[in-house]
Amino acid sequence: MAARVVTVFGGSGFIGRHLVGRLAKQAWIVRVAVRRPSRATFLKPLGDVGQITPVRAPVQDPVAVEAAVTGAEAVVNLAGILYERGKQSFTGVHARGAQTVAEAAAAAGVARLVQVSAIGADRHGVAEYARSKGAGEDAVKTAFPGAAILRPSIVFGPEDDFFNRFAALARLSPALPLIGGGTTRFQPVYVGDVADAIAKCVDEPARAGQTYELGGPRVYSFKELMELLLREIRRRRLLLPWPFGLAEFQAGFLELLPVPPLTRDQVRMLRRDNVVAEGALTLADLGIAATAVEVILPTYLDRYRPHGRFNRPSLV
């Protein structure tokens, strides 16, 4: 039987590293298309010798993208950024990049394309991130009508940039900020469940043309997530309400840092709930039981406790 090839753009990122391992176990030959292949070599041990190959293919480079998808049966686009820097813009990566991948996949005769977007993607949204994701979805649907689109809520897991960031802050600061009072609602989804969902769409032709919104089994306010975090790391910290206006003003200065902890665009995103829409196709429609936050957090946040994994049970 001929080898099945899948190209994963952005495959060295948080979701990508979980997806690549799953695809390798399903006997796919995996091309990991990234900007810097040398930073994706850590993925090779997830498969057999020669099964996982990093290749240089930035989504803004049509020639490199064309080469990366040639001969592939399936393509996954995970390429994304959380803030803009230099040539890396939301429009360039999320919109034009997605269009480039979709057009190249269609021209190469790829059988299945999976576009990973985000809950709240809307080309008329309040934040540029959401607008670029929405524009990307529209471009993909035009170029490759049979593409499956997945929209996760905030994704959590060992390498996440959400719980890890606030847990690290709680080690140093006596207070955690509640932007907008902490009332924004989220439906955190486990990275393993997201990877399973993508793998199903890669493997199952029946998923073509469908849009799925991926969330966990429960909805939380931002404040509830911070309370859950503090219980898990066994620390007491002040939860300080931070008005949207003040947060956006301060984020303007934080954006000047090489790796900004907060941007004005992210503050604007927090003005909208990030939960699965009523009537949307979900993890359940893919045959996946969503994993609860409370099950996974103890497996990686214990290192933020006052005494690490050997912490005494008392709060400090």
Name these PLM-found stretches.
Residues 42, 165-191, 231-277:
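Alpha-helical membrane-targeting segments
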Residues 161-162, 181-203, 210-213:
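Substrate-positioning beta->alpha
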Residues 28-38:
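Conserved glycine-rich Rossmann-like NAD(P)H-binding loop of the short-chain dehydrogenase/reductase
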Residues 29, 81-143, 147-153:
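Conserved Rossmann-fold NAD(P)-dependent oxidoreductase catalytic core, especially the SDR/UDP-sugar
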Residues 198-263, 276-316:
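Mid/C-terminal beta-alpha module of Rossmann-like enzyme folds, strongest
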Residues 37-100, 104-107, 119-123:
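NAD(P)H-binding glycine-rich loop region in Rossmannoid oxidoreductase-like domains
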Residues 127, 148-167, 220:
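Flexible, glycine-rich beta-alpha linker
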Residues 2-28:
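N-terminal Rossmann NAD(P)H-binding glycine-rich loop of SDR-like oxidoreductase domains
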